Amino acid sequence: TVAFGSCNYINEESVDRPGKGYGNGYEIYESIHAKKPNIMLWGGDNVYLREADWDSKTGIYHRYTHTRSIKELQPLLASTQNFAIWDDHDFGPNDGDRSFYFKYETQNAFKNFWANKTYGTDANQKEGIYSTFNWGDAQFFLLDDRFFKSPNDRLTGEKTIIGSTQFEWLIDALSSSKATFKIIVIGGQVLNPSARFENYQN
């Protein structure tokens, strides 16, 4: 059994925007744990970095530890294999892209908190959090839609979301996969033909 989830906003009043906080319903993690999944697959926005967090290693690690500390999440983290990708809010600013100046720090934090089996093309991979793993008769391909992404407002050059290195890695990995089921995980819309903001078509 594979459980999927994303958009894990944990309130912290001192750094949240005015008004009612976005986060609630944390008991969902207890419900997921009760189903005893073999894998929990986190589809991005697993933490929500705030404006106060982006500019420092201290802020980034505070956000991760604060998010991970809620009691409802502990049984799921302790008893289930967890794999993850990121999206904009755990990468950095809203709708973040490759121009984000602190992306290596957020990448390091991500790797420290998520024990994916591999990262990138080899053990020395320094850029991106894409990875793959096998489970039973399925192979999962976890893509990074932020580290290499072109800025939304860029007017020149060819735009990309996953970059050429990751794209070639994906094609090679899919071609050589012997798994019956191949599951691609990415933090944005891919099949929607409408060229809308933050859409693969766009």
List where the protein language model places each region.
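Metal-dependent phosphoester/phosphodiester hydrolase catalytic core
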Residues: 1-202
